[in-house]
Structures are given as C-alpha cells and as structure tokens.
C-alpha cells in the first residue's frame, strides 16, 4: 500500500477519542503525516501492519495513537498489573523519547499506567516500580524486557501479566536486528499471546526484517510511504526538506574545517558524528577546549549510566553540540537540530541516511554535511545510486586557523589527552578496515601520515596495520612520551606507582638471569650430576642393563662431589680426579 493522503485528524475513517485529540492539540499537531494517515485506520481496525517510511516521518504517533484507542475500546478494563501494550525499541534514548510522547497522551487517561524499562539502572528498581504502580503500557529495550521476563524469583511474574496483551509494536525493527537483538526478540515473542495486534515500523526494508514480519505478524498489511516531490519517483530515502552537503578535504585539514564551521554556527544546535567511541572521547574533549561559550556534550555506546541524563539534557537545549557515535543515528527525535555533521562517514550506507534524518524531521527544514577524504569522493555517486540521496558540494574554507599545534600542546601537557588521541587513531583505522563499502574506503589507500597529523599525534602508535611502513611526511616529537604526566594528580600518582612496580619487577627479573649466569661452576656441575644420578636411578628401576663399570664410575663421581662439598678437596683437584677417573674407566672398558 503506497497511495496515502494527508489531512486533519477529523478526516480519518475512524473517530479518535476526545482525550487523544486534546493531546494532539497540546502538542501542536494539527495535521497527519502520510505514514500516520495510512497506518492508524488499519491498526485500529485490528490489522497487523508492517510500515516502511523515511526517517523523521512521524512513525511514533502512528503507533501511539492506535495503542491508546485499542486499549480504550477494551470491554474489560485493565487492572494495575495487566499489560495491554508493549513497545520495543533498540536504544534507551529512543525508548525515553517514546515514553515522553506517550506521557503527553496518558495524562488525559489517568486509568492507564505506563512504565519505562531500559538498561543503565538497577533492574530491581524496575521490578518494585512495576509492582507498586503497574504498567498497562510498557516501553522497553529488548535486553531489559527479556531479563524481567525471566526474573520470576523477584516477586514479579511478567509472563502472567502479559496474558492480557492487545498490542505489540517493534519500532526501528531493522536496527533491532542490526544490533543483534534477534535472539532476545524471539525469547520475548515466546512469552506473548498469539491473539494480539502487531505493528512493525522501520525506515529500511531488509531480508532480516522480512523474516521477522513472517515470524511475528499474521497476514500483515504492508505500508510503504515515500517522499513527495521530484525525487519521489526514485524513492528518495531522506526527507525532501533536508539539504545534504559534502566537503572534500585532506585528513590533516578536516579538524580545522570542522572547528571553523562550528564557530561560524555557534547559536545553532548540532550533532557531530564520529566512527568510534574513542574518537568521540578524544575530539569531544578537543572541541570543549577550542570552542568557547557553547555547550558541548559527548555520548556513545560505552557510556552505560550517563547516556540517559546526557540525552535528556541535550534535548532541552536551544543550542549546543552533541558529539556522538551511531548510538544517536536512529529514530531519535531531538528538537530543532540545525546541522548534522558527519566527521567520519558511517560504516554502512543505510546508517548515512539515518544520521542525516536527525534533522529535517516531521516536515521541518534541516541540513547535513559529510566530510570526505579526496580518495573517498566516489562515495557521493554510491549514495546517489544506493540510497537515492542527492547531495551538493560545499567548498572548504580558505585560510582557516590551524588548531592542530594547540591540540598537540594539550597532549604534551596532559597524558589523558595523549592517550585518548592514540586510542582514537587506532580505533579509527580498525573501523575503517571494516567499512561496508570497502571498494571505496580502502585502508591501503589511506595517507597515514596526513591522518596522524589530523589526529595531532605526537608519535605513531604500534599496530599491525602500520607494520613495515615508513612515514617520511610525519615527524614525531622529540619529547620522551613516557615522561608526559596526567594533569589529574591522583591518576599521575597511580601511574608513578605502577611504573615503580614495573621497574622493580624488571630488576628482579634481570637479577635472576644474572644470578644464573654467574653461578659457580661447581654448583652447576652438581646440578648436572644430580640430574644424571636421578636418570640412572630411574633406568635402574626400569630394569636397565647398565654395565657394572658405568655404575662404578657414577658412584665414584658422586663420592668426589661429596668430598668437594665438605671442603676436603679443592675444585681444581676435583676436576683433575674426575677427569682421571673417567679416563681410567674408559681404558678399562676398551680392554
């Protein structure tokens, strides 16, 4: 189903309840988007739906409204511990956002309780909250929801609570599968009743999503909503009001261009995407030092407990910069983002579209800019063909301030900056090697010297990808980097302790080697004789037919060794007698 109409909420073939209409009015949504007008009537008429629509098209309301209407039409009112609807989404940030939207509606329906179940906090708190307040509508991430289904010993039998389930929604289904949640989803589906309505919402259609549709939906109506306008015939996958730009510049110029751009747009709100968590940590700290009077925040997937707080705070800001990885690339609705800046291209073409889609949402205008190296220019044609994503070139600014020496000075002054830079460089190269478009993003074509300059490295790190390579265009600093201290006194104190411990261990190790090397000849000889004696004894016990003369020689050597140990003979005499004894026995054996 592709032909859909837009219009006011009253134009729907099914009437919405007064409370829902009041909530829509409070939110300022006077008209429907195409995905909403296509999905809501079908979902409300008890159909399973599989909806594909471009990012930023208003999919959240397309399932929140039907959920409320279906629960309002229930013949039997839901009890506190009964779950009527579950919304599963891939990230905490998206779950928080959906929960906030839902709150705008449920405040008009006090009889419905809702609960947010996400990682990054104590699961027992979720259990206690559910037991106290209930959860008629659950918004959850897959990992936490699966965990709570299995926690029967904590006084909550969630499997019993979901027997009353009417609606299941899988939001950003393609991302759920991309992030490896397939086994969790299958485990969750096994707990849910078969008689339910299911909605699957996605920005892209993949074979994995198709498999999930077959497994979780019954005779679904498929909805595919495309953008209007000239590009619609080519199924453009980015919003039509999004202006997409690209800039070609060398690796050692890219950071200066980024800072210049951000300084020129200080009053606006930006997302800056990097390829790895380590790059976010490093460049985020650099931007904090170089761009004043602007709120700069960092967020990435390895932040387990801070992410929720940072995301919520940034959403409330009128302006600022959020430095992030692709954890922020999907479904997240941050109000009034003016620019999405992709410092590093993402690992896949579909992720490029989702990053851009963080701006120009629900009919608003927005802009996106991706920085590319000269060797990556063919990526533009690839995006045009693969993702139907039209782009315009933005020329690099001339005579921008060179900030890399300042970044180097920061690394020389603080070991934390130096180490972050090294980790960021290594992680970038490792991520580059795994890029989906490896015909364009080829690691062998990278200018490592220019790249190291762009990271303001003090020296090249040791890593397999650089083994055997020479970098005449890169000059490492003459400073011994081991002497660079941490600015944090506690960290530096701890580092000095570790260095001292390592020094002692090294000295002990060298001392042992020296001791073994300088051990007296007699002790070494004694050790060999002891070993020889044990070998002879073992052979004797095994029934060896050793000659009597050999045994006599061994016993004689042993007697001499005992006399040497007691000091009755000197080492010189011991050596003389030992040699003479062996010669005598050899002569006897020859006769």
Swiss-Prot record:
SMART domains: DEXDc, DUF4217, HELICc. A motif (DEAD box) lies at residues 171-174. GO terms for molecular function: ATP binding; ATP hydrolysis activity; RNA binding; RNA helicase activity. The gene is DDX55. This is ATP-dependent RNA helicase DDX55. InterPro entries: DEAD/DEAH_box_helicase_dom, Helicase_ATP-bd, Helicase_C-like, P-loop_NTPase, RNA-helicase_DEAD-box_CS, RNA_helicase_DEAD_Q_motif, SPB4-like_CTE. GO terms for cellular component: nucleolus. Its EC number is 3.6.4.13. The Q motif is unique to and characteristic of the DEAD box family of RNA helicases and controls ATP binding and hydrolysis. It is found in: Nucleus, Nucleoplasm.
